[in-house]
């Protein structure tokens, strides 16, 4: 996935995969396969900020496990009911140094919130409705079939490539 990409094509650098690292142009980058964030050695890897984008650790207590293992800050790249939300261009200046775990909301929220804020401040907004068209995600089926395991939304069983699939969103 790093050396060859459907969109960006070939990565024009020498990439060698090791058991616990990637070597890119001679620089070693550690790779971890740990499923428990508390056991990932962030401190010894000298990682200050973890971008939590697995979608599995959106609850504050779960994301804080990265702090236990040595990270100084965690940014959850999905909506979280428990971690404070900060959006660039909207309220990012209110983030305090003491905020160790924050969330950056959903990709949909990030695309609509700055525009909505400008409209609200300039002409006011009484009501609004938003529609989003999202690219295919990893959990969607490429052909019609069963929905992803444990997913209650049967619309997720539809082929992502040939259907417009109305579905839920984490957008605020």
What kind of feature is each model-predicted range?
Residues 1-142, 146-157:
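N-terminal Rossmann-like NAD(P) cofactor-binding subdomain of oxidoreductases
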Residues 148-161, 165, 169-172:
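Long, contiguous binding/interaction regions
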């Amino acid at each position: 996935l790093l050396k060859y990409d459907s969109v960006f094509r070939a990565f024009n650098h020498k990439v060698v995969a090791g058991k616990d690292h990637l070597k890119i142009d001679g620089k070693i980058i550690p790779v971890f396969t740990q499923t428990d964030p508390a056991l990932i050695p962030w401190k010894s890897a000298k990682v200050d900020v973890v971008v939590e984008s697995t979608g599995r650790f959106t609850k504050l207590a779960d994301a804080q496990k990265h702090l236990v293992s040595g990270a100084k800050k965690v940014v959850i790249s999905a909506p979280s009911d428990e971690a404070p939300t900060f959006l660039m261009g909207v309220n990012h200046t209110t983030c305090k140094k003491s905020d160790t775990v924050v969330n950056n909301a959903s990709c949909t929220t990030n695309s609509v919130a700055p525009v909505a804020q400008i409209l609200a401040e300039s002409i006011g907004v009484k009501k609004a409705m938003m529609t989003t068209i999202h690219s295919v995600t990893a959990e969607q089926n490429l052909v019609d079939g069963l929905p992803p395991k444990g997913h209650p939304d049967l619309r997720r069983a539809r082929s992502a490539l040939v259907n417009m699939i109305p579905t839920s969103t984490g957008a605020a």
